[in-house]
């Protein structure tokens, strides 16, 4: 029984990565840009209906809702060769098209105004599913629409569909370069509060690390947005392969999430992928074995989140799930796991078992691949807290100077006071503290002392 997933794409970033994701899924399932199954796509072993549904004339339509407060990106999608793929009723552009002006408050209050229209679309999609498992939200936390409208939607989805899973692919801003959005630290922190309280699982896509990987590993001097988005769509499609090419394990979203998230608040995941090459010569000298792939996945340079060194805290893995695609002998997997444990290649939490799981998945038969084996690691690692710490530091700098607060005061939620900002700062601080506590053996009783 397929458990359907509805994808919500928000704002410029969310719609751009969503667009790449659907392009990738179409290629993997042998679906043309118009949604028609290609003649060569005869293998019936994949499950298309988790992410697509079939219209009356048999062509496939993504279970996707495209939302934006300004038209530029969605118009570019509608002028692309994939324009006919989407259901036009599932596209929502705000009437006045002014956008959220990179302001979380404006994005949030726009959400309140257009709430009815958006949920008409979402409810209709949900009613069209046989057994909806949950929602996947693509957005960035730095701008206005992805952060503000995204936060509003996360809160409402929890109220409206309390039993459905909500997973997000959240793009974190690049810390290495100056941002063109001056209020980004405010936007990020306000969104982080909702990601902590209203999402079941957050896959963190860190622009700093994605840029580093594109430059170091793919040898692209100044990576463009679309090149970074291709990296992201690789991660998104690989993390959903077990849902689309089901095996006997991890073939639904809860199965994926349950193995990675033992305690509810620590649900921010980092990803790693290998082999990442655009260089054909590397393919000819490297033999990709399961052990090779699994060992490379544990190397920091392949991980798509940049975390600083922390001398005070001995950061560790809470859980790892490796999704290995390709020609794989299961006995090899067992040997590789043993080797990783014997050599202590990964440092695990002191209060629970070393949870490293492997899901084997078929590759799409329709896409040529330069590598026999490729792997995606989804990991719950305590060092992700350093990303939240740098968000807090940037926020504190602005807050201390009272910078740019005027822009927020215009919105209803901040009209009388900035209580919402203080509360968000507290929630993120509690999250950081809990990640630090998870590195210690007494974490099991953590939190009971404070109540």
From Swiss-Prot:
Pfam annotation, one family: Tubulin_C
InterPro entries: Gamma_tubulin, Tub_FtsZ_C, Tubulin, Tubulin/FtsZ-like_C, Tubulin/FtsZ_2-layer-sand-dom, Tubulin/FtsZ_GTPase_sf, Tubulin_C, Tubulin_CS
Phenotype for residue 131 to A: Weak effect possibly due to low expression of this mutant
GO CC annotations on file: centrosome; cytoplasmic microtubule; gamma-tubulin complex; pericentriolar material; spindle microtubule
UniProt GO MF annotations: GTP binding
Keywords: Cytoplasm, Cytoskeleton, GTP-binding, Microtubule, Nucleotide-binding, Phosphoprotein
Modified residues (Phosphoserine): 131
Main subcellular location of this protein, as a coarse class: cytoplasm
Modification note: Phosphorylation at Ser-131 by BRSK1 regulates centrosome duplication, possibly by mediating relocation of gamma-tubulin and its associated proteins from the cytoplasm to the centrosome.
Subcellular localization, as worded in the UniProt entry: Cytoplasm, Cytoskeleton, Microtubule organizing center, Centrosome
Gene Ontology terms: biological process: cytoplasmic microtubule organization; microtubule nucleation
Binding-site list for GTP: 142-148
Family assignment from sequence similarity: Belongs to the tubulin family.
Self-association state and partner proteins as the record states: Component of the gamma-tubulin ring complex (gTuRC) consisting of TUBGCP2, TUBGCP3, TUBGCP4, TUBGCP5 and TUBGCP6 and gamma-tubulin TUBG1 or TUBG2. TUBGCP2, TUBGCP3, TUBGCP4, TUBGCP5 and TUBGCP6 assemble in a 5:5:2:1:1 stoichiometry; each is associated with a gamma-tubulin, thereby arranging 14 gamma-tubulins in a helical manner. Gamma-tubulin at the first position is blocked by TUBGCP3 at the last position, allowing 13 protafilaments to grow into a microtubule. Interacts with alpha-beta tubulin heterodimers; the interaction allows microtubules to nucleate from the gTuRC.
Functional note: Tubulin is the major constituent of microtubules, protein filaments consisting of alpha- and beta-tubulin heterodimers. Gamma-tubulin is a key component of the gamma-tubulin ring complex (gTuRC) which mediates microtubule nucleation. The gTuRC regulates the minus-end nucleation of alpha-beta tubulin heterodimers that grow into microtubule protafilaments, a critical step in centrosome duplication and spindle formation.
Stated name of the protein: Tubulin gamma-2 chain
